[in-house]
Design a protein with these regions (language model features):
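Glycine-rich phosphate-binding loop signature in dinucleotide/nucleotide-binding domains
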Residues: 2, 64-68, 152-153, 212
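Short, surface-exposed "cap/lid" segments of acyl-processing enzymes
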Residues: 2-43
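The alpha/beta-hydrolase serine catalytic core
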Residues: 91-214
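Aromatic pocket-lining residues of Rossmann-like dinucleotide-binding sites
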Residues: 29, 85-89
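Alpha/beta-hydrolase active-site loop
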Residues: 47-65
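Short hydrophobic segments within beta-strands
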Residues: 9-13, 73, 98, 160
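Gly/Ala-rich beta-loop-alpha elbow adjacent to hydrolase catalytic centers
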Residues: 73-82
Length: 214
């Protein structure tokens, strides 16, 4: 594959463009002169977050990218957005997925979905802001419209999944990857944040993005 010319990083739920992994990728890519963008999914309102809005923001970021191969790097819920964005935008020619939340399941942070539906909002801890914030049930309703398992993705995909992930079931990721020969799944001994695997993730992503040959 040709070297990627532009990378768009899609951060996870209750995270931000200042996440440690986003910052690491931006710094490393700058050494190669690769342009970088990271939409802020907390804006204009975290409370009103939906997958559809995240996809719209990703569309705008892809549209603003320089000409040439574009890679999406998605973390957790950002990875869910990345796989759906990839089928919508031909400019995207490869994906890196980090602990991909391929379905919302029981909701974020051990949410009681029935209670969330009844009250219309969920109180969660926002890691980037280090405080509790509300998010509306519209996030869960909207996410249910999107099925990552039904997507026909032909582009190369590199996936990193922790075997000790407490938020994303590793078996779900393995099942998603099993029927897709274009997916290179790397299981690592790590938790959801993949903090202990950042060096390995960059090393393999560097090659996958065409920046360093084996």
């Amino acid at each position: 594959m040709a070297a990627v010319g532009h990378v768009i990083y899609l951060h996870g739920f209750a995270s931000s463009p200042e996440s440690s992994k986003a910052v690491r990728f931006e710094r490393e890519l700058a050494r190669y002169g690769v342009s970088f963008a990271c939409p802020d999914f907390n804006q204009p309102s975290f409370e009103d977050l939906t997958v559809t809005r995240m996809l719209d923001q990703t569309r705008d970021a892809v549209g603003a990218a320089p000409r040439g191969p574009v890679a999406l790097i998605g973390s957790s819920l950002g990875a869910f957005v990345a796989v759906h964005a990839a089928v919508q935008h031909r400019a995207v020619d490869r994906l890196v997925l980090l602990a991909p939340a391929l379905e919302l399941g029981d909701g974020p942070q051990g949410a009681n979905v029935d209670e969330w539906r009844r009250t219309g909002r969920l109180r969660i801890f926002h890691y980037a802001w280090n405080e509790h914030r509300d998010v509306k049930f519209a996030l869960y309703e909207d996410a249910a419209r999107y099925d990552a398992f039904a997507l026909d993705l032909q582009i190369p995909i590199l996936v990193f999944q922790g075997t000790r992930d407490e938020s994303v079931d590793p078996r779900l990721v393995e099942r998603w990857a099993r029927t897709r020969p274009n997916v290179d799944l790397r299981m690592v001994d790590d938790e959801h944040q993949l903090s202990a695997s950042v060096d390995e993730i960059w090393k393999e992503s560097e090659r996958f993005l065409g920046l360093k040959r084996r």
